[in-house]
Amino acid sequence: MAKVIGIDLGTTNSCVAVMDGKNAKVIENSEGARTTPSVVAFTDGGERLVGQPAKRQAVTNPEGTVFAVKRLIGRRFDDPMVEKDKALVPYKIVKGDNGDAWVEEAGKKYSPSQISAMILQKMKETAESYLGEKVEQAVITVPAYFNDAQRQATKDAGKIAGLEVLRIINEPTAAALAYGLDKKDGKTIAVYDLGGGTFDISVLEIGDGVFEVKSTNGDTFLGGEDFDMRLVGYFADEFKKEQGIDLKNDKLALQRLKEAAEKAKIELSSSQQTEINLPFITADQSGPKHLTMKLTRAKFESLVDDLVQRTIEPCKAALKDAGLKAGEIDEVVLVGGMTRMPKIQQVVQNFFGKDPHKGVNPDEVVAMGAAIQGGVLQGDVKDVLLLDVTPLSLGIETLGGVFTRLIERNTTIPTKKSQVFSTADDNQSAVTIRVFQGEREMASDNKLLAQFDLVGIPPAPRGIPQIEVTFDIDANGIVNVSAKDKGTGKEHQIRIQASGGLSDADIEKMVKDAEEHAAEDKKRREGVEAKNQAEALIHSTEKSLNEYGDKVSVEEKGQIEAAISDLKSALEGSDTEEVTTKMQKLAEVSMKLGQAMYESSQAASADTETETKDDDVVDADFEEVNDKKK
C-alpha cells in the first residue's frame, strides 16, 4: 500500500514526514537538510529553483525570488495585509484575474497556490526519493486560524502538485498529535505556535488516544517574517542616519539586509550580542559604503516587543472560549522556529505561570503530526480520535446588513447546522444568500466567502416563504452551503469557492503547467547527470590512456582519442541524447584499454606474489644429530 506523507507547508520552511513503523520520521531533502526553505526562484536563464538553491541566489536575484507566499494565499489583492506586504518584498505582487493577490515573474502571473505547489512538489520528490516509490496522497497542515478561502487555496496547491490531499489539518493540532501520541494520562495542553508568518494558539484535552480541541485563536499575519522586517527597517534607518542614503529603495540591498536580519535574530537566541557586517552595501560619488553595527539582544527585544505582546490577546481569547484559566493548563507546548527566542519563552512562562515544554523539535513536530494523521487515515495508526474545531464563526447576511451566525467559532467539526429564513419584501421571487466568516456583528466587516441566488420563489407576502439555509463543514474545515425553498422544494447547493479563488479550469491548467515543468525539470536533471557522467568518463579514460596507452595498438589508441574528442564536442551542446550516445561509443572503444589495464594489474599482482613467496623463504642452519651418541 502506497504511503501517505505528512507535509508542513510553512511560510519560511517546509518539512515532510512519513510513518516508519509506529513512529513518524522526518525525511531529509536532496541537500541533506530536514527542512526546506519555502522559496522559489525564477532565473534569467529560465530555470526554476526551489528550496535551498533558490534561497542561496536571492541576494543576486531579489526580484526573481519569491518567499513567504503563504501570507498571500487565499487573500484578495485589496486586503490591507497584502498592501503591507507589497511595500516589504522585492518581488512583484499583482492583481490576479480573479481579484486575488498573485505574483508576477518575467511577465507571467502565478497564483500563490501555484508557487506553493512548486514547494509541495519538492517535498513530494523528497519523500519519493527516500521511499523509492511514487507518492500520491498527503496530509497538509495549515494555521488553525486560516479561513475557508485560505484552506481551499492550500488544497488547490496540493492538487496542482499532483497530490490527493486526504486531509487539511491545523498546525497546532498536528503538533499535539506528535506530542501526545504516547501519553495515556489525561492532560489539558496549550499549543503556542509562532512560525514564520502566522501565530496560532490551541487548547486541547488529550489522553488515551483522544485529541479534542477545545478552542483555537490566532493571527494569520504575525510571524518571524515580521521580526525580520522590523530589523531590516532598523538597519536601514541607522544607515540613513549615518550615511544619508536610504537603502529601502534598493532591492539588492534590502535582500542583503533581510538575510542579515534573519542571521542576527537566530544568533541572538543563543548570544547576548551579534555584529552585522555588510561590505559594499551601496555606493555614492565618494565611493563604496559598508554597513557595520553591533546589535544586542536587549535592543532586538525592545524593537519587537509589540510583536511579542500581540501573541497574548489570542491566548486570552482561546482560554476564555475553552472556559479555562491559565493555571488549569497542564503543559504548554512550543511550536515554530520563533519560539526559540528567549523573550518569547519568558512571555509564555509569565502568562501561563509555568515553564513551557521544550521536548519537541519546533521545526519538525507539525510535519510529524501530519504523518501520524496520514497513518490514522490509512489505518496504520489505531485508536486515535481527533476532534478539531472551526476557528471562525460562519453565517449569512440578513436584513440591515447584520451578520447572523449559524455556526459559532470553536464548534467541533465535521458539523452541520440549518436555520429557516424568510423574504424581506412582498412577492419577492428570489433571494441572494451571502455567506460570511468572522466575528464582527455587521456582515460587511467579515470575510465574504461566497454568494448565490435561490430563484423561483412563488409570489407571497413578506415573511411567508420558508427558506432553509444549511451549513456543512467537513473535517478539512471547508464549507458547503445549501438553500432550499420549503414550499417548492427548490434547492441550490454550492461548495464554497472563495469570491476570488481558483476555478476547476484554472486548477486543471495549473496542474498541466506543473506536469510540464516537472518533465522539464526531469529533462534538465537528466542532462546534468549525463554531463557529470561524461566528464567523469573523459577524466578516467584520459588518465588510463596516459598510464596504459602503450599497452594498446596505435589504431586503438587513435579510436579512443577520437571518441574522447567527439564526447567533448557533444558536451558543448545541450543534446542529452547525443552525449549519452557518444559516452556509449567511448565506453565501447575503451574496452581494449580496460583489458590492457586488467592484464597489467594481474601481471603486477603475480610479480608481487612471487616476491612475497621469495621473501617467505628462510635460510636455516642445520646441525646433524647423531642419535647413537647418547
From Swiss-Prot:
Q: What are the protein's UniProt keywords?
A: ATP-binding, Chaperone, Nucleotide-binding, Phosphoprotein, Stress response
> SUPFAM superfamilies per the record?
Actin-like ATPase domain, Heat shock protein 70kD (HSP70), C-terminal subdomain, Heat shock protein 70kD (HSP70), peptide-binding domain
Bias (Acidic residues) occurs at 608-624
Do the record's keywords include Heme? no
Report the CDD domains cross-referenced here: ASKHA_NBD_HSP70_HSPA9
Q: Which GO terms describe its molecular function?
A: ATP binding; ATP-dependent protein folding chaperone; unfolded protein binding
What species is given as this protein's source? Bartonella tribocorum (strain CIP 105476 / IBS 506)
Instruction: Tell me, using the record's free text, what induces this protein.
Output: By stress conditions e.g. heat shock.
A Pfam family hit: HSP70
Q: Which NCBIfam families match?
A: PRK00290.1, PRK05183.1, prok_dnaK
Q: At what positions is Phosphothreonine found? A: T198
Q: Give the protein name, as stated in the record.
A: Chaperone protein DnaK
Q: What does this protein do?
A: Acts as a chaperone.
User: Its family?
Assistant: Belongs to the heat shock protein 70 family.
Q: Where is this region: Disordered?
A: 598-630
Q: Which InterPro entries match?
A: ATPase_NBD (IPR043129), Chaperone_DnaK (IPR012725), Heat_shock_70_CS (IPR018181), HSP70_C_sf (IPR029048), HSP70_peptide-bd_sf (IPR029047), Hsp_70_fam (IPR013126)
